[in-house]
């Protein structure tokens, strides 16, 4: 499959939770058979997709845990009080907030407008670059 089909799969049926993926419908995808080289259409189910991405989901959880372990006590207190905010396209992966929250015991939320908020925040930082430099 190509990148566009992979993105469609992620949006429509991918889940960070194998257990909850069982509740999601399957979908038909089209691509090229790697053995024959011919076009092929197959049905894939959400559980298989969830199993296929589990290593990536676990890597995200490990990275979050390592970051939390290295965080100052003051920031850790803020994280406990206010939670973790997910941004970017990956934040839209079904059940990701719940999976991360279960693993970290910290509330997890999806940012408002997760696809654009990083770019918007970067733009705001660039507008205030002198203030940012003084904070160092």
Spans of model-derived segments:
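Glycine-rich phosphate-binding loops at beta-strand->alpha-helix junctions
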Residues: 14, 76-100
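PAZ/PAZ-like end-binding module
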Residues: 35-40, 44-45, 64, 104, ...
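Conserved phosphate-binding/catalytic loops in two-lobed NTP-binding clefts
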Residues: 98-124, 132-136
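Residue-level signature of catalytic and energy-coupling elements of molecular machines
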Residues: 64, 86, 122
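Short flexible coil/turn linkers enriched for glycine and charged/polar residues
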Residues: 21, 36, 80, 102-104
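Phosphate/ATP-binding catalytic cores across multiple sugar-kinase/actin-like superfamilies
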Residues: 52-79, 125-128
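Charged, alpha-helix-enriched surfaces in structured cytosolic catalytic cores
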Residues: 1-4, 8, 44, 48, ...
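Phosphate-binding glycine-rich/basic clefts of nucleotide- and phosphate-handling proteins
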Residues: 1-54
């Amino acid at each position: 499959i190509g990148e566009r089909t992979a993105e469609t799969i992620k949006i429509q049926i991918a889940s960070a939770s194998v257990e909850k993926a069982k509740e999601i419908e399957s979908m038909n995808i089209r691509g090229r058979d790697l053995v024959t080289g011919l076009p092929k259409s197959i049905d894939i189910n959400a559980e298989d997709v969830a199993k296929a991405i589990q290593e990536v989901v676990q890597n995200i959880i490990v990275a979050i845990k390592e970051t939390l372990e290295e965080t100052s006590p003051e920031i850790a207190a803020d994280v406990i009080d206010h939670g973790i905010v997910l941004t970017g396209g990956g934040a839209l992966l079904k059940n990701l907030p719940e999976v991360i929250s279960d693993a970290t015991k910290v509330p997890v939320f999806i940012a408002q407008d997760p696809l654009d908020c990083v770019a918007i925040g970067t733009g705001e930082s660039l507008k205030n670059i002198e203030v940012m430099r003084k904070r160092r």
